[in-house]
Amino acid sequence: MHELSIARSVVDICTENAGGRRVCSVTIEIGALSGVATESIRFCFDACTRGTLLENALLLIEHVPASGRCRQCNSEFPVKACYDPCPACGGVGMDLITGEELRVKGLTVV
């Protein structure tokens, strides 16, 4: 379960940026193709924040849908899986634009 190490990293990032103040909420972005299980992150976050500046902090998760750009016709389209063909031309080569995100977007401190 790599969500535990991700949750630890989120706590570390927030602690470094909180300036010694208590953190009330943390907002993270998780892309649809990131491979991160939202419920596991929530569970691990709660466990990792005990006894820290983030204890009892609210974890807000923003889901980022996947989108891609066709290498053949340059069309942008929503992606459900990395091997989806382009709906405009049927091409199979694409570059992901969004969907792999995993980042701390912001935090609220007191």
Swiss-Prot record:
Keyword Ion transport recorded: no
Recorded superkingdom: Bacteria
Organism: Geotalea daltonii (strain DSM 22248 / JCM 15807 / FRC-32) (Geobacter daltonii)
Protein name in UniProt: Hydrogenase maturation factor HypA
Entries under PROSITE patterns matching the protein: HYPA
Residues annotated as binding Ni(2+): H2
Encoding gene (name): hypA
Keyword Transcription: no
Keywords: Metal-binding, Nickel, Zinc
Signal peptide range: none
